[in-house]
Amino acid sequence: MTTSIIERIDAWAEKTPDFPCYEYAGTRLSYKELKRQSDAFGSFLLNNLNTDKEKPIIVYGHMSPLMLIAFLGSIKSGRAYVPVDVSMPVERIEQIKKAADPSMFICTEELPSNLTITGCPVLSQEQLMDALEKHFDEVPDKAECVKNDDNYYIIYTSGSTGNPKGVQISQNNLVSFSNWILQDFSLRQGLRFLNQAPFSFDLSVMDLYPSLLSGGTLVPLDKTITANMKDLYREIPAQNFDVWVSTPSFADLCLLDENFNQENNPSLTRFLFCGEVLAKKTATELLDRFPDAVIYNTYGPTEATVAVTQVKVTRELIEAYPSLPLGVIKPDMRLHIVDQETGEILPEGEKGEIILIGASVSKGYLNEPEKTDQVFFDYKGYQAYHTGDSGIIKDGYLFFQGRLDFQIKLHGYRIELEDIENNLKKVSYIQNCAIIPKMKDEKVDMLVAQVIPTNHDFEKEYQLSAAIKNELKEFMPAYMIPRKWIYKTEFPLTMNGKIDRKALNSEVNK
C-alpha cells in the first residue's frame, strides 16, 4: 500500500536504478535519473521561490521527459503542478494562467511566438536545463514535499462560461486512486504502459502513476505518431506494450488495422478504458483479437480522480446487458443514485443522478468557491460530488444513462456544449448557434454545429465553414471544433422561448 507517491517512486531508484521509467522518441529516462533530476529541480524551486506554496506551478509542454521531472520536482518543493499541453490555443493557455495564478510558469517546450506570460516568473527550457545542472546531486528536504490533503495536481476542464475550471486533486486523492488501480487491476512490477493521452487530460494519470509506482516503463505515443495512421500502426507492435490505457475511440482507430491483434502484440494482456462509453462492439472485437487479454471498463469524472468504478469485461457480461456496465465502486468510495429534484436516494433499478462520496473526491475548483459549492458538498463527514451524470444500478453494477446537462465526452475529452457555443458566438460570421452531439454505437461520434450566420459574401457553405473554423482555431482547442456545419435562418423554439434542442437533436440523430 502506497502512503506517499514520491517516496514510492523514489524507492525504485534504489531497487532498479537503471530500469527505464520513461521512453520517448529514442530517449530513455531511468529511475535513478528521474530521482536525481527531480531532486535537483525541487531544490532549485525551494531556493528560488518565496511565494505561497498554495500557488501551483504551470508545466507547459507535450511528452518530453522534462515534463515528468518538472512534475515531481514541483511536488518535492511542496507545490502542485498544472499540466498544459502544447496543443492548447494561446487564448486557452492565457485563461488557465489567469485562473491558476501560478508561482512559476515552466516551459519544457518553446512557447508560441504570440504568447507572452506576465505576472509570474517564466522558466525557459534552457533555464530549466541549467537549473538541473546547477543543482546536480542536491536533495530537497522531505518535509517540504506535498503531503496528505495538499494539492498534488490541478487539471483544467471545460467550463460552461467558456472559461476552464481547475480541479484540485490532493496527495490523498491520488494515493487512494493509485492503490486501487495497482491492487484491483493486478499490475505487477516492470510492465510497459501505453500513454496515449496528453498530461493535461486526466486519463494520463491512469498510466503515469500506476506505471511509476509499480516500477514500470511509460511509453507515450505523441501527437506526431497518433496523427498519422501508418506511423501509429507501425509503432504499436514495436513498443511491446503490456498495459493499454486509452479512450475506447483510440482503440477503435487501432482496430482499423487488421494487424492489431495478439499475434503481433503478444505481451499486450491488459486493456484499461476510461473517458467515454465503451461500446459492446469494441469490446467484442478486442476479445476476439486478443484472447490472452483482460479488458477493464472504468468510469469517473476528473473531480473524483480519474476513475472510481471498474468491471472486467467478459463475453458473458457483453451478452447479459443491452450496454456494458461501468462496474462497481472502489472500496473506499460510496455511490448513490438520487432524484435530481429532491435529492432522495433511489432504489436499485431507478434512474437518477450519480453522486460520488469518499476518498477520491476533489476538494473543489481552484480559486472558484462559488462553482465549488454548486457541485461539491459534505455527506455525513465525507466529501461528495454531484456528477451531473445520469445512472442506474442493476445487479449491483452501475450503468451510464447520459448527461443531465449539456456536458458530453468526445474521444475522451470532457466538453461543455455551452463552452463551445459561447466560443462560437465570438466568431464574426455567427449570429446564433447550437451544438448537437451526433451519436453512434452508444457514444458521441462527432459534434454538429447548427448555425444562424450573420450576413456574409460567401457563395458556398463550405467557404463559410472554412472561414469560421479559421477564426475558431485561434482560441479553441481542435477537439472542440465541430466537424459538421448546418446553416439555418431560424431555430425552433420551446414554449418558454428557448431553443428547442430536442427538435434539433431529432434532426441530427434521425
Curated annotation (Swiss-Prot):
Q: Which PROSITE patterns match?
A: AMP_BINDING (PS00455)
Going by the UniProt record, its keywords in alphabetical order are: ATP-binding, Cytoplasm, Ligase, Nucleotide-binding
Cite the GO molecular-function annotations of the record: ATP binding; D-alanine [D-alanyl carrier protein] ligase activity
Binding of D-alanine occurs at: D202, V306, K498
Superkingdom to which the source organism belongs: Bacteria
Provide the reaction this enzyme catalyses. holo-[D-alanyl-carrier protein] + D-alanine + ATP = D-alanyl-[D-alanyl-carrier protein] + AMP + diphosphate
Q: What is its EC number?
A: 6.2.1.54
Q: Which GO terms describe its cellular component?
A: cytoplasm
What Pfam families does the entry give? AMP-binding, AMP-binding_C
Q: Which GO terms describe its biological process?
A: lipoteichoic acid biosynthetic process
The EC class name is ligase
The pathway this protein participates in, as annotated, is: Cell wall biogenesis; lipoteichoic acid biosynthesis
Residues given in the record as ATP binding sites: T157, S158, N297, T298, Y299, G300, P301, T302, D389, K498
Main location per the UniProt record: cytoplasm
**Compartments reported by the entry:** Cytoplasm
Supply the HAMAP family for this chain: DltA
Question: Entry's PANTHER family?
Answer: ENZYME, PUTATIVE (JCVI)-RELATED (PTHR45398:SF1), PTHR45398
Q: Which family does it belong to?
A: Belongs to the ATP-dependent AMP-binding enzyme family. DltA subfamily.
Q: What does this chain do?
A: Catalyzes the first step in the D-alanylation of lipoteichoic acid (LTA), the activation of D-alanine and its transfer onto the D-alanyl carrier protein (Dcp) DltC. In an ATP-dependent two-step reaction, forms a high energy D-alanyl-AMP intermediate, followed by transfer of the D-alanyl residue as a thiol ester to the phosphopantheinyl prosthetic group of the Dcp. D-alanylation of LTA plays an important role in modulating the properties of the cell wall in Gram-positive bacteria, influencing the net charge of the cell wall.
Query: Could you tell me what this protein is called?
Result: D-alanine--D-alanyl carrier protein ligase
Q: What gene name is given for the protein in this entry?
A: dltA
